[in-house]
Amino acid sequence: HIPSPDNQLLAVSCMPPELTDGTYESHIYVLPMTGGEPKDLTGPGLSYLHGWSPDGKELAYCAFRKKPEEETMRIEICTIPSDGGEEICLTDGKGYNDGPEYSPDGKHIWFNSTRSGLMQVWRMNRDGSGLTQMTDFDANNWFGHVSPDGKHVIYLTFAKGELEPNEHLPNMYVSLGMMDYDGQNKKKVLDLFGGQGSINVNSWAPDSRRIAYVKYVLHHK
């Protein structure tokens, strides 16, 4: 769930309550922060919310889509107006695309994708142009989160070979990496036992000086 920039609305992705036949779907809804009737923006299919644009006009999400003439499911980065409207998929069907997040100035969308082989952090303009790979080392990198001051990006790294590139599981040794907004000065911040859930959402402090993360405690007998 993500609050709107003005804190008046709440966006969530969840299973529609009317599905009682065992079918699984995930729709994106918007409702008043104080409660009320939710508005279904995406309709049938699998849509997983990740970002709300700083101007409050759009939502960005990971969408599983398949046209009638297609044999396999596409995992795309899509956007939709926050008050409802046409879905626009910004990626081109290449690879597994996930984790879209707007930059603080709203000019870019950061996401991760296997389009180059391993999972890597990418950046594109808000309209889908200017696609740029931001990490390129021999590991699987997920969930690039931009600091509020727009200077740094934190991301989660899984070692190559331990998982398929499109997998991010819990209970694993992983690391947090950081780079400048332009992709320079990459460095490891720390190693931890965690994985899925460690930094799935942007958890930078408002002053950009610290970041919260989840690690798991190892119990030795």
Q: Language model features by range: what are they?
A:
Residues 32-36, 81-85, 125-129, 180-184:
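Short loop/turn segments that connect beta-strands within beta-propeller blades
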Residues 13-28, 42-47, 62-77, 91-97, ...:
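A flexible loop/linker signature enriched in serine peptidases of the S9 family
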Residues 1-10, 44-59, 92-112, 138-156, ...:
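Conserved beta-propeller blade repeats
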Residues 181-184, 189, 198-204, 214:
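CBM-like carbohydrate-recognition segments
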Residues 37-42, 86-91, 131-135, 187-191:
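A short beta-strand motif characteristic of beta-propeller blades
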Residues 7, 18, 56, 67, ...:
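Feature marks short, surface-exposed loop/turn motifs that line or immediately flank catalytic pockets
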Residues 1-18, 31-34, 38-39, 44, ...:
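Acidic, proline/glycine-rich low-complexity intrinsically disordered segments
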